């Protein structure tokens, strides 16, 4: 693949600074850190660094984003390059009251919509589930949250979630359900699975989905990250939110940044599975 670089940032002069900065949602940071580590071996004279926290937008050279993200605060960025996909799964705390209420239930897309969203326009054939009314939904309010993608997958807006909104990174959603026995949320695969063991992170439990029997075990608490990635790359159930993830550069970025982007396309995508992302198809 080629970026087809013919813009000013590919043709312009190098900047004086040898440091380039990247901002990323937490779910993609381990992958970005791997890119930085590997790219340094090919061009040691240029350093790429992850920006933690809010950071100054003017100081950011590259931004990891996804297709449904609200880019209202990224007007100075363009030339987005998609390198993979993230999947989002509903979760609760293992052995919690919410897990007990949902035990044995295999939720289809309509039931998931009823569980997570305000019920003003549900289909007539979707019976009301009283157990759902007891459950507290936690969703992210940050612009980099997967909440918008999750909502759009079910034909909803992020403003339609039931329950409580959590500011900050989506990893805090895991903390929220750990503290609330009735809490249910959703998160990207790399926030749900341990990237080393490839199993669910300690204390988490997947909400059961209405999937074919040969797939159901992989989406249970006994499943592995690699099982899930393989299944989702061969088919995309309506119950699972999948969103393209890309990297975009600032309009003032220089040739060093363009070389890094080209390297990501040619070499960086081979690390997608290792860090919990699907490959593009």
Where do the PLM segments sit?
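A short, hydrophobic beta-strand-centered structural micro-motif
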Residues: 64-66, 184
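N-terminal post-signal-peptidase region of extra-cytosolic proteins
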Residues: 65, 71-77
């Amino acid at each position: 693949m080629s970026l087809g670089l013919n813009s000013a940032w590919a043709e312009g002069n190098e900047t004086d600074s040898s440091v380039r900065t990247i901002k990323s949602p937490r779910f993609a940071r381990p992958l970005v850190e791997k890119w930085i580590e590997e790219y340094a071996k090919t061009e040691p004279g240029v350093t790429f660094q992850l920006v933690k926290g809010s950071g100054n937008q003017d100081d950011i050279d590259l931004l990891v984003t996804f297709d449904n993200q609200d880019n209202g605060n990224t007007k100075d960025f363009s030339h987005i390059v998609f390198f993979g996909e993230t999947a989002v799964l509903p979760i609760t705390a293992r052995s919690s009251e919410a897990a007990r209420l949902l035990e044995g239930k295999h939720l289809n897309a309509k039931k998931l919509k009823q569980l997570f969203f305000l019920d003003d326009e549900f289909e007539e054939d979707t019976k009301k589930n009283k157990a759902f009314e007891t459950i507290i939904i936690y969703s992210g309010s940050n612009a980099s949250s997967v909440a918008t993608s999750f909502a759009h997958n079910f034909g909803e807006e992020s403003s339609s979630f039931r329950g409580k909104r959590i500011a900050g990174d989506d990893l805090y959603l895991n903390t929220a359900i750990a503290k609330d026995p009735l809490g249910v949320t959703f998160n990207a695969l790399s926030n749900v699975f341990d990237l080393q063991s490839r199993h669910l992170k300690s204390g988490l439990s997947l909400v059961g989905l209405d999937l074919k029997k040969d797939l159901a075990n992989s989406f249970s608490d006994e499943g592995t990250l690699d099982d899930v990635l393989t299944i989702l790359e061969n088919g995309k159930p309506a119950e699972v939110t999948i969103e393209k993830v890309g990297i975009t550069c600032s309009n003032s970025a220089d040739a060093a940044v363009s070389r890094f982007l080209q390297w990501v396309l040619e070499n960086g995508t081979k690390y997608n599975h290792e860090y919990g992302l699907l490959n593009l198809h």
